[in-house]
Amino acid sequence: MTIQLQKPDITELKPRITVFGVGGGGGNAVNNMITVGLQGVDFVVANTDAQALTMTKADRVIQLGVNVTEGLGAGSQPEVGRAAAEECIDEIIDHLNGTHMCFVTAGMGGGTGTGAAPVVAQAARNKGILTVGVVTKPFHFEGGRRMRLAEQGIEELQKSVDTLIVIPNQNLFRIANDKTTFADAFAMADQVLYSGVACITDLMVKEGLINLDFADVRSVMREMARPMMGTGEASGPARAMQAAEAAIANPLLDETSMKGAQGLLISITGGRDLTLFEVDEAATRIREEVDPDANIILGATFDEALEGLIRVSVVATGIDRVAGIGEQNIAEMRAAAAKPLIRPSAAVAPAPAAVQPAHAVSQAPKTVDQIAQTIRSAEAEMERELGFAAHQQPSQDFRPQSKLFASSPAEAPAALRPAQPVQQAAPAPVAQAPVYHAPEQVAVPAPRMQQAQAPVYQEPAPVGRQPEPVRMPKVEDFPPVVKAEMDHRDRATPVAQEERGPMGLLKRITNSLGRREEEEVPSDMMDAPSMAPQRRAPLSPEASLYAPRRGQLDDHGRATPSSSSHHDDDQLEIPAFLRRQSN
């Protein structure tokens, strides 16, 4: 009896990486990576367009939405693409079985990529697969609607992946020129995806002095939001520094930087001529850009095809956490800087000005508030003594005119002196001038407003109001009764000027004849005009103020007739030869 010994089958334990292309943009990225010859990766393409699936180079394809779209595409509607992916969710999960790391690539802004990519990523995440999203944003010339759909799809995909890399197609203009073809430009965008995948696969698959396992990669990229990914190649004396600089500055990524990164994965690949100093120089340059406490994982491998060249690939993660803290600090600094700017504007407005003293009381000592209160009260007293009376005079109807035409100018200060008790005690103005009691009561809150606004308007001192305490009245300021009297005086002015001139011979004769006719008028006719002034006197209570200026003139500015004076004038002014002729 013979015993046959057979070696047991050993299951190969190695990480399995899958690149899942969704939609038209994801399928094109997979085709470019297959053309370049990326090894150690499985490719899967899913699309709602049956015609696009026939042109793919991948061996594993998924027709999304057989019942929803019937192979005609999503029509740039993300809802249709999402429904198509949910219809084939079981087939998607089957292709993800046994995968340790999945790259989900798509072009955002369309229907299938925008709607189906989050579904595929969520399915991979639910199975515990390290999920990395690599998506592109549309060009600006594709319109605002497509850009808005892309932004919404990126926000939805961010919730379902561990790490998300966004490549705006508009950034292709940074590296393209007028001779760059359209296909070559998209190949440059796919190079970002290729470099990221190759960076990880080379460290785990290829021969090297410093090899990494998949657990190291997972510790760097798990739950790290948006990363920064770049690759640089250089040759010559300073090739290590040049390659590191090119890897740090990736012009295609969406305005990201390695500043403050929490996780860093560095892959340095070169020929057999790679030296220790070059590795140290490249790694040190990259380490200067990240956080001092960052988790840095370094790998160095050899590639016979890179004789004379050096390739440096970098994957930096955890950038959004530091950026969020930096934005918060910037917001706090802006808020702190904006506080002193609010106080001057609040001092000008009446409402915030009342709040500002309360804020000052909580910060300043009480002695400062007492001094400020004393200064404000003193300024308010000066305002009331010097300027308040002059401001309140135009609001009254006739009192300024009575002060202006008063007989003695020394009475003006006496009239101003009662202004102080009028503002403080209410009964005083009632006893002196009951007619103007209402305007003076309304004007009482005015000093309070001046006290609230006194700290703001300190420049115009009250001394400037002393040269002109009383304003010259205008015709419009007079009441209707005085306006009528002024009109009559203007009309009677030429007549009065003629009578005041030197009297000629004919004027004296006519005056003497007119005066004799006036003496013969009956007493009833003479009493009628004399009664008119007596009846009109009560209508103008201020008429007595004009009495010193009128003298012997009537309301029309003419001299009042007198019988005795007329007779004396006849006897004195008429020559003797005229009296003989008249006799």
Curated annotation (Swiss-Prot):
List of residues binding GTP: 24-28, 111-113, 142, 146, 190
A Gene Ontology cellular-component term: cytoplasm
Alphabetized Pfam families for the sequence: FtsZ_C, Tubulin
Region feature (Disordered): 391-425, 510-583
InterPro entries (alphabetical): Cell_div_FtsZ, Cell_div_FtsZ_C, Cell_div_FtsZ_CS, FtsZ/CetZ, FtsZ_C, Tub_FtsZ_C, Tubulin/FtsZ-like_C, Tubulin/FtsZ_2-layer-sand-dom
GO biological-process terms attached to the record: division septum assembly; FtsZ-dependent cytokinesis; protein polymerization
Keyword terms, alphabetized: Cell cycle, Cell division, Cytoplasm, GTP-binding, Nucleotide-binding, Septation
Compartments, as annotated in UniProt: Cytoplasm
Claim: Cytoplasm is one of the keywords in the record: yes
GO molecular function, one term: GTP binding
Top-level taxon: Bacteria
Principal location listed in the UniProt entry: cytoplasm
Biological role stated in the UniProt entry: Essential cell division protein that forms a contractile ring structure (Z ring) at the future cell division site. The regulation of the ring assembly controls the timing and the location of cell division. One of the functions of the FtsZ ring is to recruit other cell division proteins to the septum to produce a new cell wall between the dividing cells. Binds GTP and shows GTPase activity.
Name of this protein: Cell division protein FtsZ
Protein species of origin: Rhizobium radiobacter
Taxonomy of the source species: Bacteria, Pseudomonadati, Pseudomonadota, Alphaproteobacteria, Hyphomicrobiales
